[in-house]
């Protein structure tokens, strides 16, 4: 009775003329404050009016449409299981539900009252400290019941470890918003990455006209933007999504004169945000922590000499001074460089032909390459000095803690396969950046998981390219409040670790996971369906060490994107849950051999809530598809 009165009070003014059309239906639904997909409302409205051959509905039709869109049988079943009168949940009944089903073992009574006050829309019911079915729907559909743990939505990890102890959200070719040959360079690439919590940006610097450096994909037809404009964007957005340090990874192709200009822009625009000297002792034996570097911007570039030598020059005018960096270039025909893909391949090049060889060809003779660096720019490099990777043995013997390596995707994959223990040992000491192979002209991405498995901190992806790799990236870095830094597991931080992702042995910490896939709600209509009648299925995927990789697929529900019901349970045993991600992918079965992507959600396995949860869905481009969701029950131990 109270629900009916509440409902009529909200909508009855809309029916003063007896009947309403589709637009008025949408406006009334908005007054009820429950999100809806317009395509589904259109579909239900059309089914209603088609019966009568008219284009308006009465108040009872509207009630039926509202219930079809908002009231869910699966919610009603749970509600009735705990409500003695099947009309309202008393605070004690809600407390019992929270304890038994949602595992709120502490403070359940307080939480129950908070839920009632926050979600109960009917005044009389709320005053009695009860929850109506309308309130229960609103609670179960809310952020408080999403599958991502509430505790992990803010920074909860220890942020006082050295920088090398964290996975760091990193982008590759940040300035591009499409492909790498003729696409535009765009400041929006930097804005978008920073707003997503990215903490390492790549800036490709080249000589520009009027002594003004430009940013673009060298030797290609991509458009150019000024370095100055990029730094202004960094200054504005660096800490919009996270307080923790931003690293500017310079891919520097500039003359020393324009390198001087780069240094001036960094100093003048970023001001106090730019880190220009070490924190604490000048002699650096350990990298500082993200906490110590809050609101700081670091420059990653080649550097002349040591930090100590830089500080001795402090205060001296180094304008016009240059230094020289020498490094051995040991190349073989499968060697990758961080050089950009030219528009036209050089004739006679054997690089591309040899990428598929099963065994590496003999190494060629080492050449010594010398590069000139403006001292003004060199001195801005403090904790992120770019150092060419020679070998794990060389790094262990000679590399300083603030020297970082960039390793190409193909070489890194070989290390993962043949020298995983050494790779883990290396990344426990030094920040290591992985970048995509040069042949990815379309800005495609590799699977980042295999490099996270060995502790690589900066696994750089093309943020502009949608697909599973970026979904894994976005899902992983949801953790720790989305701040862009995630503390690596202890076995990837410990310098004496013998962890190997291919044979986890004593590092196994098995977790048994059970997920009951109950239903879907207002799934996005298929792009290939004109009738709004998708045939949805859900694929559950585990990403982690090779032993943990798994895929399970639900049955197909025919012709129902509005409210498909599965009630299927999937079980997994995960050996290294600390590295695992779980991905829910919803597809429309087009044929026996083809499916159309409808939406997905990825999150760290250890960020799963327990109990009844909604799984929000995201589009290919990473946009939220609200109110599209899955409804699941999660249990693990």
From Swiss-Prot:
Comp. bias intervals (Basic and acidic residues): 310-322
PROSITE patterns with a match to the protein in the record: C2, PIPLC_X_DOMAIN, PIPLC_Y_DOMAIN
Reaction equations catalysed: a 1,2-diacyl-sn-glycero-3-phospho-(1D-myo-inositol-4,5-bisphosphate) + H2O = 1D-myo-inositol 1,4,5-trisphosphate + a 1,2-diacyl-sn-glycerol + H(+)
InterPro entries named among the record's database cross-references: C2_dom, C2_domain_sf, EF-hand-dom_pair, PI-PLC_fam, PLC-like_Pdiesterase_TIM-brl, PLC_EF-hand-like, PLipase_C_PInositol-sp_X_dom, PLipase_C_Pinositol-sp_Y
Segments forming domain EF-hand: 36-72
Record's subcellular location: Nucleus; Cytoplasm, Perinuclear region
Active-site annotation: 172, 217
Identification of the protein by name: 1-phosphatidylinositol 4,5-bisphosphate phosphodiesterase zeta-1
């Amino acid at each position: 009775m109270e629900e009916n009165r509440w409902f009529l009070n909200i909508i009855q003014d809309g029916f003063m003329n007896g009947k309403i059309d589709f637009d008025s239906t949408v406006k009334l639904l908005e007054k009820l404050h429950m999100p809806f997909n317009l395509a589904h409302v259109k579909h239900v409205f059309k089914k209603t009016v088609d019966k009568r051959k008219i284009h308006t509905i009465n108040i009872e039709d509207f009630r039926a449409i509202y219930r079809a869109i908002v009231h869910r049988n699966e919610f009603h079943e749970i509600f009735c299981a705990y409500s003695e009168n099947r009309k309202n949940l008393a605070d004690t009944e809600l407390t019992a539900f929270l304890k038994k089903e949602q595992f709120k073992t502490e403070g359940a009574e307080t939480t129950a009252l908070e839920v009632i006050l926050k979600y109960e829309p009917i005044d009389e019911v709320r005053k009695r400290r009860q929850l109506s079915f309308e309130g229960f729907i609103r609670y179960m559909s809310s952020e408080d019941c999403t599958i991502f743990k509430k505790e992990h939505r803010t920074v909860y990890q220890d942020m006082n470890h050295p920088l090398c102890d964290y996975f760091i959200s990193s982008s590759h070719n940040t300035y591009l918003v499409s492909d790498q040959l003729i696409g535009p360079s765009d400041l929006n690439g930097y804005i978008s990455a920073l707003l997503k919590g990215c903490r390492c940006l790549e800036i490709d610097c080249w000589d520009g006209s009027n002594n003004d450096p430009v940013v673009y994909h060298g030797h290609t037809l991509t458009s150019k933007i000024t370095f100055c404009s990029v730094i202004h964007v960094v200054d504005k957005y660096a800490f919009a999504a996270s307080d923790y340090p931003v690293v500017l990874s310079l891919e520097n192709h500039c003359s020393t004169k324009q390198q001087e200009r780069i240094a001036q822009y960094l100093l003048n625009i970023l001001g106090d945000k730019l880190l220009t000297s070490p924190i604490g002792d000048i002699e650096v034996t350990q990298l500082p922590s993200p906490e110590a570097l809050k609101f700081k911007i670091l420059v990653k570039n080649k550097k002349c000499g040591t930090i100590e030598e830089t500080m001795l020059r402090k205060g001296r005018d180094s304008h016009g001074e240059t230094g020289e960096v020498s490094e051995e270039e040991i190349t073989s025909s499968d060697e990758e460089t961080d050089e950009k893909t030219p528009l036209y391949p050089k004739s006679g090049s054997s690089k591309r032909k040899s990428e598929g060889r099963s065994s590496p060809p003999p190494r060629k003779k080492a050449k010594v390459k010398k590069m000139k660096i403006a001292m003004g720019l060199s001195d801005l490099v403090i904790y992120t000095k770019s150092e060419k990777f020679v070998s794990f043995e060389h790094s262990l013997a000679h590399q300083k803690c603030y020297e970082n390596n960039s390793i190409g995707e193909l070489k890194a994959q070989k290390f993962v396969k043949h020298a995983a223990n050494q790779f883990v040992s290396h990344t426990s000491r030094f920040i290591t950046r992985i970048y995509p192979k040069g042949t990815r002209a379309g800005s495609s991405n590799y699977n980042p998981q295999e490099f996270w498995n060995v502790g690589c901190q900066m696994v750089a992806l093309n943020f502009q390219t949608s697909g599973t790799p970026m979904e894994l990236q976005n899902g992983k870095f949801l953790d720790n409040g989305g701040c862009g830094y995630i503390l690596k597991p202890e076995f990837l931080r410990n310098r004496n670790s013998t962890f190997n992702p291919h044979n986890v042995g004593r590092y196994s910490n098995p977790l048994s996971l059970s997920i009951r896939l109950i239903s879907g709600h207002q799934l996005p209509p298929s792009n290939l369906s004109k009738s709004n009648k998708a045939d949805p299925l859900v694929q559950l995927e585990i990403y982690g060490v090779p032993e943990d990789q798994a895929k399970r697929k639900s049955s197909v529900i025919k012709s129902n994107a509005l409210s498909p019901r599965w009630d299927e349970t999937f079980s997994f045993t995960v050996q290294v849950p600390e590295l695992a991600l779980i991905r829910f992918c919803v597809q429309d079965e087009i044929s026996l051999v083809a499916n159309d992507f409808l939406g997905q959600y990825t999150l760290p396995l250890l960020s799963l809530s327990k109990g009844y949860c909604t799984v929000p869905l995201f589009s290919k481009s990473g946009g939220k598809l609200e109110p599209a969701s899955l409804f699941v029950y999660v249990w693990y131990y």
